[in-house]
């Protein structure tokens, strides 16, 4: 599990975990509305930087009172999306980046602000699977490059290294809506 803060938001602590061999994805999908986390299909993530970029953008939207979703955790999924089409954008982001019934690797994100308490063991109470270190190496083992390229409309983008693709993903996230 990664526990971190973003320098611009020192009062918000982030807990991020990667799980593989998840055996209860259908149950999680059915109870998503009650869970206070962002739950992302790890096939759609290539790097820590990609996810942290979306988290930063979601926190910025919250700080400016511009959330387009009901909470920060859903906003993270929306911020992963490179598209700025407001129509059906939230549903599309959930379909593209959220946990699916066939997901076997997932990333959970919990943002804790102020006096709110959180027990990190809560992740393993929700997910039946093996918790891994949240690292670029572990994410790349789960990443589906074709799905990522399709989600970000980068099918023709040529790159020699995955770091270049990761940078393109971060740019797409940060430039969306400008």
UniProtKB/Swiss-Prot annotation:
What coarse category fits the chief subcellular location reported for this protein? nucleus
Swiss-Prot/TrEMBL keywords? Activator, Chromosome, Nucleus, Telomere, Transcription, Transcription regulation, tRNA processing
- The reply on keyword Isomerase is no
- Taxonomically, which superkingdom? Eukaryota
Subcellular compartments: Nucleus; Chromosome, Telomere
* GO annotations of cellular component type: chromosome, telomeric region; cytosol; EKC/KEOPS complex; nucleus
**InterPro entries attached here?**
CGI121/TPRKB, CGI121/TPRKB_sf
One Pfam family per UniProt: CGI-121
Q: Does the keyword Chaperone apply?
A: no
Report the Gene3D superfamilies cross-referenced here. CGI121/TPRKB (3.30.2380.10)
Task: Give GO terms for biological process.
Answer: positive regulation of transcription by RNA polymerase II; telomere maintenance via recombination; tRNA threonylcarbamoyladenosine modification
Q: State any single GO MF term.
A: tRNA binding
* Reported function: Component of the EKC/KEOPS complex that is required for the formation of a threonylcarbamoyl group on adenosine at position 37 (t(6)A37) in tRNAs that read codons beginning with adenine. The complex is probably involved in the transfer of the threonylcarbamoyl moiety of threonylcarbamoyl-AMP (TC-AMP) to the N6 group of A37. CGI121 acts as an allosteric effector that regulates the t(6)A activity of the complex. The EKC/KEOPS complex also promotes both telomere uncapping and telomere elongation. The complex is required for efficient recruitment of transcriptional coactivators.
Q: Record's family?
A: Belongs to the CGI121/TPRKB family.
Q: What is known about its subunit structure? A: Component of the EKC/KEOPS complex composed of at least BUD32, CGI121, GON7, KAE1 and PCC1; the whole complex dimerizes.
**Designated name of the protein:** EKC/KEOPS complex subunit CGI121
**Which organism was this protein described from?**
Eremothecium gossypii (strain ATCC 10895 / CBS 109.51 / FGSC 9923 / NRRL Y-1056)
Ranked from the top, the taxonomy reads:
Eukaryota, Fungi, Dikarya, Ascomycota, Saccharomycotina
Q: Which gene encodes it?
A: CGI121
């Amino acid at each position: 599990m990664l526990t971190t803060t973003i320098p611009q938001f020192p009062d918000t602590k982030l807990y991020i975990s990667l799980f593989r061999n998840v055996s209860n994805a259908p149950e999680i999908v059915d109870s998503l509305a009650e869970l206070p986390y962002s739950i992302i299909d790890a096939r759609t993530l290539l790097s820590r930087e990609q996810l942290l970029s979306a988290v930063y953008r979601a926190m910025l939207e919250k700080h400016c009172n511009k959330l387009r979703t009901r909470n920060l955790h859903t906003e993270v999924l929306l911020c992963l999306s490179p598209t700025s089409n407001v129509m059906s954008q939230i549903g599309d982001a959930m379909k593209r980046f959220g946990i699916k019934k066939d997901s076997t690797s997932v990333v959970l994100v919990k943002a804790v602000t102020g006096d709110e308490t959180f027990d990190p063991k809560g992740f393993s109470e929700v997910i039946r699977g093996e918790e891994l270190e949240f690292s670029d190496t572990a994410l790349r083992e789960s990443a589906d490059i074709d799905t990522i390229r399709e989600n970000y409309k980068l099918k023709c983008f040529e790159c020699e290294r995955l770091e270049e693709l990761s940078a393109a993903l971060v740019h797409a996230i940060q430039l969306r809506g400008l």
